[in-house]
UniProtKB/Swiss-Prot annotation:
Protein function: Component of the DASH complex that connects microtubules with kinetochores and couples microtubule depolymerisation to chromosome movement; it is involved in retrieving kinetochores to the spindle poles before their re-orientation on the spindle in early mitosis and allows microtubule depolymerization to pull chromosomes apart and resist detachment during anaphase.
Subunit structure: Component of the DASH complex consisting of ask1, dad1, dad2, dad3, dad4, dam1, duo1, dad5, spc19 and spc34, with a stoichiometry of one copy of each subunit per complex. Multiple DASH complexes oligomerize to form a ring that encircles spindle microtubules and organizes the rod-like NDC80 complexes of the outer kinetochore. DASH complex oligomerization strengthens microtubule attachments. On cytoplasmic microtubules, DASH complexes appear to form patches instead of rings. Interacts with sim4.
Compartments, record wording: Nucleus; Cytoplasm, Cytoskeleton, Spindle; Chromosome, Centromere, Kinetochore; Cytoplasm, Cytoskeleton
TM regions (residue ranges): none
GO cellular component: condensed chromosome, centromeric region; cytosol; DASH complex; mitotic spindle; mitotic spindle pole body; nucleus; outer kinetochore; spindle microtubule
Stored InterPro entries: DASH_Dad1 (IPR013958)
Organism listed in the record: Schizosaccharomyces pombe (strain 972 / ATCC 24843)
Domain of life: Eukaryota
Name of the protein described by the UniProt record: DASH complex subunit dad1
Gene Ontology terms describing biological process: attachment of spindle microtubules to kinetochore; cell division; mitotic sister chromatid biorientation; protein transport along microtubule to mitotic spindle pole body; spindle attachment to meiosis I kinetochore
Chief localization: nucleus
Family indicated by similarity: Belongs to the DASH complex DAD1 family.
Gene name, Swiss-Prot/TrEMBL: dad1
Keyword vocabulary terms for this entry: Cell cycle, Cell division, Centromere, Chromosome, Chromosome partition, Cytoplasm, Cytoskeleton, Kinetochore, Microtubule, Mitosis, Nucleus
Keyword Cell division: yes
Amino acid sequence: MSSENMDITENIQNEQNKDFDDIDFERRRRLLTLQISKSMNEVVNLMSALNKNLESINGVGKEFENVASLWKEFQNSVLQKKDREMLDAP
């Protein structure tokens, strides 16, 4: 085979390899993009579930505000009574 034919053959092979590399790159990029998209959707779903749980916890906490207020008033009255008794004691 002449040197010129070898150069042409080598150039063709290089072009084919480049095309295969480009195709492989595009395929891998698409796969990575799909994986990222899937992962982001999963993150959004998990964040939504977390938000619902936090809202539920906040709602439960608000239900106990009246009870907590009542116990606080009771504690304050008991402490005030003790303070008065200590002041009145000889």
